[in-house]
Structures are given as structure tokens and as C-alpha cells.
Amino acid sequence: AVGQAPVNAEALTAFREQYLSALRQRSEGKTIVTDKMPQNFCFLGLVATALPEAHIIHVKRSSAAVCWANYTQYFANDSLGYCYSLDDILHYHELYEDLMQYWHEAMPNRIYDLDYEALTERQEEETRKLIGHLGLEWDDACLSPQDNTRSVATASNVQVRQKVYQGSSERWKRYKPYLYGALDHFSADNK
């Protein structure tokens, strides 16, 4: 197909080995690791090919909420510099949505969509579905992330120490009068 290069088996193997080695170094001996880097969606084809055993979980959330959360979060990573311009965030988010649609079409049944709002409204039900999808045994600790004491390397370190709660997807609405319609672009999503 146009724009597709042949798969280089050596490069895939090298990527796989380097990535798994890096995970082992950071995982403190854990066998299950979540890599939640914001740009991961760009590499789902590579991940699916080089790491066929990997589960791809796509957390879907209100577009306006995602854009606002990115805009108001300080990221030390230079690759997230687009987060300091609302126009750049909106453009980036459109690209993200287009690429995720492509991945869903290119890899049917390979990506598990987890609806953020549904998770906050029906935590146990949605968490049980996710755990079942992953083929893991249920553990009641899944319902109490605030009690987990292991280290977590994330910009949202404070959030992962809190109970699952509703309302964060509405936070942007407090600032709507000052955004001059910037997030209205996602009108179907912003009710």
C-alpha cells in the first residue's frame, strides 16, 4: 500500500528487546506495566507488531476535558510543548482522533476502549470489564487506587493517589467565558 514500507524483522526485534529491557529496569520486578505516555497512540502499529502480547487500552474522554487538562498541566517533557498553546492542543487533538480512528479500522478488536466518564460513574462494573478483557483475576484493590503505595512515574501523580471521582471532565466549563469559544469546536462532546 502507498506509504507503507516492508517490515524489517531485525529492527522490530531490536525495538522489542530494548523496550522490554527498559520496562524491566523501571518496573521493580512487576510483570504487568502500564505505559501511559500521551504520544503512545502514534505508535500503536509498531506496538501491535513488535509486542503482539501487549494489551492496548484506549481511555476515551471528553475532547474538551482532555484539551483543558493538557493545557493546565505542566509537563517537564519537551515533546509535550504543544500543551502550552490552546490552538496547538486543538490541532493535535484532531490529529489524535483521526489516527485513533485509523488504528481502530486497521486493527479491529485489537484496541480496548475504556470510557473515562463511564468508569467514574460505574467504577466497579467498568473495572471488572477491563480486568476480564486483560484476562486477569479480580482483586478488590482495583476499586481503591488511593490505597496503592507503589511508586508511579506520571505527571498526574497526585491523581493516581485519589479515589476515582466524577466531575473532572467538567472542570473546563468554569473557564468557558474566558476561552472565547476555543473548546466549542468539540460541541457534540461538550454538553
Segments predicted by a language model, with ranges:
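PAPS-dependent sulfotransferases, especially Golgi type II membrane carbohydrate sulfotransferases
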Residues: 3-28, 70-113, 120-191
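Glycine-rich phosphate-binding loop used to anchor ATP phosphates in small-molecule kinases
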Residues: 18-48
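Short beta-strand segments
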Residues: 32-37, 55-60, 113-118, 131, ...
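Acidic-histidine catalytic/liganding microenvironments
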Residues: 37, 51, 107-108
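Short, solvent-exposed loop/turn segments at secondary-structure junctions
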Residues: 38-41, 62-65, 73, 117-121
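Short hairpin/turn module used for nucleic-acid contact or packing/dimerization
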Residues: 41, 54-56, 64-66, 81, ...
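Short N-terminal helix/helix-N-cap motif within the alpha/beta-hydrolase-1
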Residues: 42-45, 68, 124
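Conserved phosphate-donor/acceptor-positioning beta-strand/loop module used by diverse small-molecule
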Residues: 47-71
